[in-house]
Amino acid sequence: MSKGHRSQDKKERNKANREKRPHAHLRHVRVSDIKARVVLREIIGKNVVEARALLLYNPRYAAHLIRKLLDSAVANAENNMGLDHATLFVQEAHATKGSSYYSRWRLRPRARGSASRIERKVSNISIFLGERQSAGAK
């Protein structure tokens, strides 16, 4: 039997299943998910300081967006969970395909005199951080 209204039950259930790791999401960003994954593969498993340095000197456009997202995830970990940024590392990072949109007036010529609209790629990027234990503690 439920304790209250179904919206209250759903709120309690969602609170129990909420993600416990520090994380940050970037939604509907105007970069291809394939190009974002190339940058994300470089930082998975690295500590936060090293990952930020890699992103700072990466010439790709997606690296700038991912660096800001990493800074947001670190700030979430420090402010919301009270973790030290020296012990944090990038545990999981992924980019998924978002809902792409079409350029309104630009067309790409196709076969037999036809044309199709140019599709603009959009992606959703997520970064999850983990906490490494210090070398002294076992």
What is the role of each PLM region?
Residues 98-138:
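Strongly charged
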Residues 2-94, 124-132, 136-138:
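Ribosome large-subunit tunnel/peptidyl-transferase-proximal elements
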